[in-house]
């Protein structure tokens, strides 16, 4: 089965050393920037990693994303905006919901608010929900 992974679930897979579950699954093109921002915060704001670790992780994430099906949503901003409005979620989050709905696969996220809000449109799961199937 295929899935759409949001940035929270990809980061969680990285932390759990389970990036294997990401291969050949879907995400949106903005994920690269969301993950870069998460890692930047880990170094600059939280001081959990060094600058050398940050650069190494950015390179590793690039290789991970290269194994995923990263889709652009540039043609569908109006539909994404409508989802964001109707579910009262961010445009970023709505892009993942849009993709999951469009290709008819579950959305994998660690965001509890998104799990609840997206349920009317798509099936939502966490990484833990699917980890046993890999």
Regions found by a protein language model. Give the residues of each.
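Acidic, PIN/NYN-like endoribonuclease modules and their adjacent C-terminal/linker elements
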Residues: 1-2, 27-28, 99-102, 106-134
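Generic detector of well-ordered alpha-helical packing
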Residues: 7-9, 35, 94, 112
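PIN/NYN-family metal-dependent endoribonuclease catalytic core
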Residues: 14-48, 52-56, 70-71
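Amphipathic alpha-helical segments within well-ordered protein domains
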Residues: 36-40, 62, 81-84, 97
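Active-site neighborhoods of divalent-metal-dependent phosphate/nucleic-acid chemistry enzymes
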Residues: 68-106, 110-113
């Amino acid at each position: 089965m295929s899935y759409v992974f949001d940035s929270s679930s990809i980061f969680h897979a990285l932390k759990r050393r389970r990036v294997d579950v990401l291969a050949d699954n879907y995400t949106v093109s903005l994920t690269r920037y969301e993950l870069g921002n998460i890692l930047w915060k880990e170094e600059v704001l939280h001081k959990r990693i060094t600058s050398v670790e940050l650069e190494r992780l950015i390179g590793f994430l690039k290789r991970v994303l290269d194994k995923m099906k990263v889709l652009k949503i540039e043609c569908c901003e109006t539909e994404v905006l409508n989802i964001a409005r109707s579910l009262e979620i961010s445009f970023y989050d709505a892009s993942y919901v849009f993709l999951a709905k469009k290709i008819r696969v579950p959305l994998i996220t660690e965001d509890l608010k998104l799990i609840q809000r997206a349920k009317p449109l798509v099936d939502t799961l966490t990484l833990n929900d699917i980890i046993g199937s890999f």
